[in-house]
Amino acid sequence: MSGVVVVGAQWGDEGKGKLIDVFAEKADMVVRYQGGANAGHTLVVNGQKTVLHLVPSGILRPETTCVIASGVVIDVFSIRDEIKKLKDTGFLQNPKQLLISDTATLILPYHKALDAAREAALSDGKIGTTGKGIGPAYEDRASRRAILFGDLFDKDNLKKKLELALTEKNFMLENYYKGSTFKADDLIKDLLAVAEELAPYRTKDTSLFISKSLKSGKRVLFEGAQGTMLDILHGTYPFVTSSSTLASNACASAGIGPASVQKVIGVFKAYTTRVGSGPFPTELNDEIGKKIQADGHEFGSTTGRSRRCGWLDLVALKYAIRVNGITNLAMMKLDVLTGHDRIGVCTAYKLNGEIITDLPTSPYELEKVEPVIEWIPGWTQDLTKVKTLSDLPRPTTNYIDYLGSQLGTPIDVISVGPGREQTLWVKPLFNN
């Protein structure tokens, strides 16, 4: 079995979309296993930029089957528009290329309204939600009252479940947040219309389809969204997303056993970024941070928000390697660090006068740490035209070698630009 999980090893926005698109050349299938339209995966092919939020990043390769698994929360109006844009630009011409699980949870307009109302009510304690309704939709799934993708195709059941949901949601919106309410008839009309458009992609049991594909020798990539440090259980809670972003969730969401996974690839930037609130030990609130932000175009593809930037944090990265069981690493945006006299790498933290090398479990402790920085000589050469590893300047290879020795996990892929061709391979993705 050739299952490979691709997981974000930082706070998201590591470049997983580009990597999945590159990997998909050698894969038969890409499975998106968690999150929702809060993800923004940017792909650049032949100079054309495509931003995906729900559709798996393998969709730009016509021969690759893409699956949205049970653990994803789907805004049906958003995915309808995303599919239309793909079709209008020449992609997804065959509906059999995209399969959507019947048991995936729906994000409905009242989820987004609740998300926005709650964030506004938090005042100074904002989490930094994207306002896409992700959290409220996952809440409904956990409380066993979610409306699923398959419900769209059963009008009577959809009406019954929607009316029950609105009894609670409208009460909350009106009485707790003084907001507008929703009418069941209007929502049902809109949902039935979008159901017709999405019907060609409906798949009752994606778990069975994925399992059969793996057993027949197909190469399957599992695409995560966000990053390890945003995991609901093992991230910097409460400054996290509402799903498990770890590699282990690929199996649970897709409905396969862990023995199906051959390797776990952790994706990280050559520096660190974070969007929204929460601790960020290596954050640079100076001209260097602004330069990294500008050179890396560090603005969210989903929200447009600027990303906080800082030096690479090896304490957090080693934590991600441990909790995911990462076997191989991919370093993205190495080209962005061109032009710095020296490059900082955080190798430890100082907390209350003591040096620590393990990530604190409390975000409030993490907020107090001071990064212990080691300095590596920088380089001035433009890396975006580099075609082979041997063409990299010596200071750059020294940086790569230093990180590899510190992390104890091989760096197999290095990205030096947004395009497919700007990818350097140390070792092939699949073993066979």
Curated annotation (Swiss-Prot):
The keyword GTP-binding applies. Mg(2+) binds at D13, G40. IMP binds at D13, E14, G15, K16, N38, A39, G40, H41, T130, R144, Q226, T241, R305. It is found in: Cytoplasm. It catalyses: IMP + L-aspartate + GTP = N(6)-(1,2-dicarboxyethyl)-AMP + GDP + phosphate + 2 H(+). PROSITE patterns: ADENYLOSUCCIN_SYN_1. The keyword Phosphoprotein does not apply. Disulfide bonds: none annotated. GO terms for molecular function: adenylosuccinate synthase activity; GTP binding; magnesium ion binding. Binds 1 Mg(2+) ion per subunit. Pathway: Purine metabolism; AMP biosynthesis via de novo pathway; AMP from IMP: step 1/2. Homodimer. Plays an important role in the de novo pathway of purine nucleotide biosynthesis. Catalyzes the first committed step in the biosynthesis of AMP from IMP. Belongs to the adenylosuccinate synthetase family. This is Adenylosuccinate synthetase. The gene is purA.
